[in-house]
C-alpha cells in the first residue's frame, strides 16, 4: 500500500460544499474520529490528515505560505501532505491521504469508524 488509510467499515461524511472549495483553496474539517484538510487542485479534490505524523499535534493551514504547519515542532507540510520543513532529527512521515469524493456538489471524506477506547 502507498500509505493510504483504507478504513474497512468507514462512512462517507460531508466536509464541504463543492462550491465552497475554489481551485487551490484549502478547507479544514474535523469529524471527531478524523480531522484534516481538503484541497482542490487542477479540478481534483484531495484530502490529507490534519494531524502531524510526528506526535499527533493538530496542524493549521497558513495561507500566506500555502503550508500546513505543526505548532509543536515547527514542522510544515505541503497541502499534498509532503514535509516541507522540519527541525527534528529525522523527518516525519508524509501525511496520510483519505479517500475523498465529490458527489452532487458535496465533498465527502471516507471517515474511519470511531476508534475503540484503548
What does each model-found stretch correspond to?
Residues 59-64, 76-82:
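Iron-sulfur (Fe-S) cluster-binding segments and ferredoxin-like electron-carrier domains
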Residues 1-65, 94-118:
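N-terminal pre-ligand scaffold of iron-sulfur
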Residues 66-74, 84-95:
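Short cysteine/histidine-rich metal-coordination sites, predominantly Zn2+-binding motifs
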Residues 71, 79-80, 101:
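Extracellular/periplasmic metallocenter environments
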Amino acid at each position: 500500500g502507498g500509505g493510504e488509510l483504507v478504513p474497512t467499515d468507514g462512512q462517507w461524511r460531508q466536509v464541504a460544499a463543492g462550491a465552497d472549495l475554489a481551485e487551490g483553496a484549502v478547507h479544514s474539517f474535523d469529524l471527531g474520529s478524523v480531522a484534516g484538510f481538503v484541497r482542490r487542485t487542477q479540478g481534483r479534490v484531495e484530502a490529507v490528515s490534519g494531524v502531524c505524523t510526528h506526535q499527533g499535534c493538530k496542524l493549521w493551514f497558513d495561507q500566506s505560505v500555502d503550508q500546513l504547519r505543526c505548532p509543536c515542532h515547527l514542522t510544515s507540510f505541503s497541502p499534498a501532505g509532503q514535509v516541507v520543513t522540519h527541525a527534528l532529527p529525522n523527518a516525519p512521515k508524509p501525511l496520510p491521504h483519505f479517500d475523498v469524493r465529490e458527489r452532487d456538489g458535496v465533498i465527502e471524506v471516507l471517515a474511519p469508524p470511531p476508534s475503540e477506547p484503548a
